[in-house]
C-alpha cells in the first residue's frame, strides 16, 4: 500500500515549530527561575548582612576538592549541558524513537527490543513534552554539577547523573548494545551514558572517601579490567575484526565505518572516515592488532595502579581515543540525530580522573586539623537550627545556581510526568506523518450506499451529526485495520458526545463489494458492537462514483492473492453536510502511539464542530 511505512516526517514544519515554541517558552521560564532566585538571594543578603558575613568567614573548606573530582564534575557537567543542547535539535522530538532508539535496538535480543520499544512508544505519545524534558533535565544536571563543588548538593548532583544516565543507557542506548552482536569498544561499548553514570557515582561519594588511597586504586583497577576485557573481545576470532575484507565484502570494522560515512555530515569528516575505511579494508589485520595491543597495554598499566606507568600510557590512550572518535565514531554527534559525542570523550575524562586519583592521593596526615576535629552535623541538627532567611543569606552563589538547576530539571520533568498520566497521544504525532491536513468549507459530495447490515444510508440521512469518514479495504491486513481501530478509539474518546458523531467507512475494494465481507471485517476488528460505526458498500458503479466525487484515485488492482493497493484518506463533515477537514492519512510505523495520536486528532476535530474546545 503506497502510504505504509513512509514513516514519520521529522521535518514537518508544524511539528518543528511546535517543538521550538515549547523550548522557547520553557527557556524563558528557566531564565525567570534563575532571575527570581538571584533576586531573592541578593535581597535577603542585604537584609541579613551578619549572616552573609558569617558565610564569608567560613568559605575556606576543611578539605579542598581533589583534582580527579574536579575533572569529573566539570568535564561531565559540560558534557551534560552539551548533550541537552543536542537534544534541542528541531527533528529530535518526533525523530528520536524512530531514527535513533528503535534502530539501535533492532539487532538486540527480542526482550531488549520490547523494553526499548515500550519506551519509544511512551515517548511518542507526547513527543513535545518528552523532547523538552530531555533537554532541560540534561542541561539542569550539567549546570548542577558545574555549580555545586562540594557538600550535599554536589553529591546529589552526582546521584542525579547516575539516575538519568542509567535511564538513557537502558532506554536510549539499548543497554549500550552489550547484548547485540558486533559489540566493540571502537564503537562505544558499553555505552557512553554508562560512563556518565560511573562518573556520577564517584562524584556522589562522601568527602571522607576522597581521603582514602583505595579510591584511586579501585578506580584504576576497574578501568584496567574493562580495557583488558575489551581487548580480549576485540581479539576474539570469528567476530570479523581481523580481516579488512572477507569474501569480497568489507570486514566488521570497515563495514561499520563505511555505513557511518554515508550519514549526513560535513564533507571533510566523511572523506576522513572513507579514507580510514579504505585503509582498514587493505590492512585490517594490522589495524586490529594495534587496537588490541593498545587496549591490553593500557589495561595492564591501569591495573598496576602505578602513576609512573599510567601517566605515559594515558597520553597514548588519549591519542587512540581521539583517533577513534574522529575516524570511527564520526565525532558521535555530527551524523544524523546525534544525541551525544559518543564514548571516547567521557572515556578520556574517566581515565584522566583515575590517573589523578592515584597520582595525587591525599595522605591522612595532610588532613587539616579543622577537618580532623570537626564534629559531623546531621540533617536533623541542621533542620532544627535552620532559619530560612538567614540560611538563604549565608548561602553561596553556587548553592543558588544549584537550586536554579534543580528548578530547571523540574521544569522539564513535570510536564512530561503529567502528560504520561494521559492514555491519549498528543495529536502533534499525527501531524508528523507524511500527508496533509487542510481546513476547508464546502458541501461534502453526496453518497447513497448500503451499510454492513443491509440498510440504506446516505449523507443526507446523517445530517445533524458530525461525520468522520474514511475509505477501507475489507481484505486489507496492514493500514486499514489500524485506521479502523483509530476510528474505534476516537468513538471511545468522545464519550457521551459519541451519540452525535457517526464513524463512517466506505468500501475501497472493487473486488469484494458484498455485505458479507464488511461484516467479516467488523467482526475481525471488534467493530460489530460499536453503535455509531457504519461500513458502507454498493455496486461497483456506485463506489467508483463516490471515489471520484471525493477525488480519490481508483484502487490499483494487483495480482490475485494480494491486497488492493490504495492510499489512505479521512474527512471531517459537519452537521450541515459541509466538508470541514481533509486528512492525508498515513499510519506511518503503525505504533500504538501513532494510532492513539490519530484517534485524538479525529476526536478533537469532532469536538470542535460540536462546540467543545
Features from the language model and the residues they span:
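Short active-site neighborhood of thiol/selenol oxidoreductases, capturing the structured segment around
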Residues: 458-487, 503-504
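Extended, low-polarity transmembrane helix blocks
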Residues: 2-140, 144-432
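Short, acidic, Ser/Thr-enriched surface-loop or helix-capping motifs
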Residues: 81, 139, 451-452, 573-574
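Structural microenvironment flanking redox-active thiols in thiol-disulfide oxidoreductases
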Residues: 482-546
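N-terminal "domain-start" segment that seeds a small globular fold
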Residues: 423-460, 485
Amino acid at each position: 500500500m503506497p502510504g505504509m511505512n513512509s514513516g514519520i516526517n521529522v521535518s514537518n514544519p508544524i511539528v518543528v515549530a511546535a517543538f521550538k515554541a515549547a523550548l522557547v517558552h520553557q527557556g524563558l521560564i528557566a531564565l525567570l527561575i534563575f532571575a527570581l532566585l538571584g533576586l531573592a538571594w541578593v535581597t535577603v543578603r542585604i537584609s541579613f548582612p551578619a549572616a552573609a558575613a558569617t558565610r564569608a568567614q567560613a568559605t575556606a573548606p576543611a578539605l579542598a576538592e581533589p583534582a580527579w573530582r574536579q575533572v569529573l564534575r566539570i568535564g561531565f557537567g559540560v558534557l551534560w549541558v552539551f548533550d541537552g543542547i543536542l537534544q534541542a535539535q528541531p527533528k529530535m522530538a518526533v525523530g528520536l524513537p524512530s531514527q535513533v532508539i528503535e534502530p539501535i535496538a533492532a539487532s538486540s535480543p527480542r526482550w531488549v527490543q520490547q523494553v526499548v520499544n515500550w519506551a519509544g512508544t511512551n515517548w511518542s505519545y507526547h513527543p513535545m513534552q518528552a523532547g523538552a524534558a530531555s533537554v532541560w533535565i540534561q542541561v539542569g544536571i550539567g549546570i548542577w554539577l558545574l555549580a555545586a563543588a562540594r557538600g550535599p548538593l554536589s553529591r546529589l548532583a552526582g546521584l542525579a547523573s547516575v539516575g538519568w544516565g542509567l535511564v538513557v543507557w537502558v532506554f536510549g542506548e539499548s543497554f549500550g548494545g552489550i547484548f547485540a552482536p558486533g559489540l566493540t569498544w571502537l564503537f562505544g561499548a558499553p555505552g557512553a551514558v554508562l560512563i556518565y553514570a560511573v562518573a556520577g557515582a564517584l562524584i556522589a561519594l562522601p568527602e571522607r572517601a576522597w581521603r582514602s588511597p583505595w579510591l584511586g586504586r579501585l578506580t584504576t583497577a576497574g578501568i584496567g579490567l574493562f580495557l583488558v576485557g575489551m581487548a580480549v573481545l576485540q581479539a576474539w576470532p570469528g567476530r570479523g575484526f581481523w580481516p579488512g575484507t572477507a569474501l569480497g565484502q568489507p570486514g566488521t570494522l570497515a563495514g561499520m565505518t563505511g555505513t557511518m560515512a554515508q550519514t549526513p555530515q560535513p564533507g571533510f569528516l566523511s572523506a576522513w572516515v572513507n579514507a580510514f575505511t579504505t585503509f582498514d579494508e587493505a590492512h585490517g589485520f594490522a589495524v586490529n592488532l594495534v587496537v588490541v595491543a593498545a587496549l591490553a597495554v593500557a589495561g595492564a598499566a591501569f591495573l598496576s595502579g602505578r602513576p609512573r606507568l599510567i601517566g605515559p600510557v594515558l597520553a597514548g590512550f588519549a591519542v587512540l581515543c581521539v583517533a577513534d572518535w574522529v575516524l570511527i565514531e564520526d565525532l558521535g554527534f555530527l551524523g544524523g540525530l546525534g544525541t551525544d559525542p559518543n564514548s571516547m570523550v567521557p572515556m578520556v575524562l574517566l581515565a584522566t580522573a583515575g590517573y589523578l586519583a592515584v597520582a595525587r592521593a591525599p595522605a591522612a596526615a595532610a588532613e587539616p586539623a579543622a577537618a580532623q576535629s570537626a564534629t559531623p552535623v546531621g540533617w536533623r541538627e541542621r533542620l532544627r537550627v535552620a532559619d530560612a532567611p538567614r540560611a538563604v543569606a549565608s548561602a553561596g552563589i553556587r548553592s543558588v545556581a544549584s537550586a536554579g538547576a534543580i528548578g530547571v530539571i523540574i521544569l522539564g520533568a513535570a510536564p512530561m510526568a503529567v502528560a504520561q498520566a494521559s492514555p491519549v497521544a498528543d495529536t502533534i504525532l499525527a501531524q508528523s506523518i507524511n500527508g496533509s491536513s487542510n481546513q476547508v468549507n464546502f458541501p461534502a459530495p453526496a453518497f447513497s450506499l448500503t451499510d454492513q447490515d443491509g440498510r440504506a444510508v446516505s449523507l443526507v440521512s446523517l445530517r445533524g451529526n458530525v461525520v468522520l469518514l474514511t475509505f477501507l479495504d475489507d481484505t486489507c491486513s496492514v493500514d486499514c485495520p489500524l485506521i479502523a481501530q483509530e476510528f474505534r478509539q476516537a468513538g471511545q474518546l468522545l464519550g457521551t458526545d459519541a451519540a452525535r458523531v457517526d464513524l463512517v467507512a466506505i468500501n475501497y475494494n472493487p473486488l469484494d463489494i458484498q455485505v458479507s465481507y464488511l461484516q467479516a471485517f467488523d467482526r475481525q476488528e471488534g467493530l460489530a458492537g460499536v453503535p455509531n460505526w457504519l461500513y458502507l458498500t454498493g455496486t461497483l458503479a456506485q463506489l467508483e462514483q463516490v471515489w471520484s466525487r471525493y477525488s480519490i484515485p481508483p484502487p490499483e488492482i494487483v495480482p490475485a492473492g494480494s491486497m488492493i493497493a490504495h492510499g489512505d484518506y479521512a474527512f471531517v463533515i459537519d452537521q450541515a453536510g459541509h466538508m470541514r477537514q481533509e486528512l492525508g492519512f498515513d499510519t506511518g510505523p503503525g505504533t500504538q502511539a501513532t494510532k492513539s495520536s490519530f484517534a485524538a486528532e479525529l476526536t478533537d476535530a469532532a469536538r470542535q464542530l460540536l462546540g467543545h474546545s
